[in-house]
Amino acid sequence: MKRIHLHLLSDSTGETLEMIAKAALAQFENADVVRHFWPMVRSRQHLERIVPELSNNPGLVLFTLVNAETRRALRDHCRRLSLPAVDALDEVTAALEVQLGQEAHGRPGRQHKMDEAYFKRVEAIQFTIAHDDGVGWENWEEADIVLAGVSRSSKTPTSIYLANRGYKVANIPLVMESPPPPALYELKNPMVVGLTTAPERLVQIRRNRLLTLNEQAETSYVEKDRVTEEVKFARRLFSDNNWPVIDVTRRSIEETAAAVIRLHNERHARVKPGEKPI
């Protein structure tokens, strides 16, 4: 298997660049890639200190540098070293300049500016952590989204992912012997979304969870017929209350969250200004 070096250079935290690289590499199976991460490259002097590493470990250079001088210097070095260099945001930024009729600011780290959106995200994360696993149902009306599902149906990780996107999320486990609080059926503002999965997959996930905790592997918690009844119970509840349902069986957390966001956006698109969501 061929090993390659991938250099990621950013004038900010590098979070955007890492996500782009991760998404691209996901298209290749068993890729042997050595990543070299260079964040906060904001001066020519800093760049010059990195160049020897590029020379010693030649490979693809992927970068997001908004400063024209630093960007030009990096391209010159890559040409001299015969290294392929890709500006991850160049074409997108250029297209937006044409459509918006204005030039990009060219200042690094603007997406991390501590503005209203930043504080909204922090507030969403705090709310979501405080309303995990059925806790704090008295405040659910303040949520944007409430996720419901049986144990191990990815409620918590999906909630945290959504919180990082700025959504206040509460989640509640559905247990046949313990009905949800009445507040769940009285919510007006939040969108309630049901998460379901195939019983076979759920049994597998629960068994792995018990092994991780060094607990007994043979209990009703992982018994196939019992788990099937749990899933049926949850689906009936979703249907009776006309809640949208997402099957997470073959979805990643990111894919599940994207489906929830789409449902949320569609719901609010149907609401006229000044009205409350139905």
Swiss-Prot record:
Keywords: Kinase, Nucleotide-binding, Serine/threonine-protein kinase, Transferase. Its EC number is 2.7.11.32, 2.7.4.27. Coiled coil: none annotated. The keyword Transmembrane helix does not apply. InterPro entries: Kinase-pyrophosphorylase, PPDK_reg. ADP binds at G149, V150, S151, R152, S153, S154, K155, T156. It catalyses: N(tele)-phospho-L-histidyl/L-threonyl-[pyruvate, phosphate dikinase] + ADP = N(tele)-phospho-L-histidyl/O-phospho-L-threonyl-[pyruvate, phosphate dikinase] + AMP + H(+); N(tele)-phospho-L-histidyl/O-phospho-L-threonyl-[pyruvate, phosphate dikinase] + phosphate + H(+) = N(tele)-phospho-L-histidyl/L-threonyl-[pyruvate, phosphate dikinase] + diphosphate. The lineage of its organism: Bacteria, Pseudomonadati, Pseudomonadota, Alphaproteobacteria, Sphingomonadales. This is Putative pyruvate, phosphate dikinase regulatory protein. One of its GO terms (molecular function) is protein serine/threonine kinase activity. The keyword Signal does not apply. It is an enzyme of class 2 (transferase). Pfam families: Kinase-PPPase. Belongs to the pyruvate, phosphate/water dikinase regulatory protein family. PDRP subfamily.
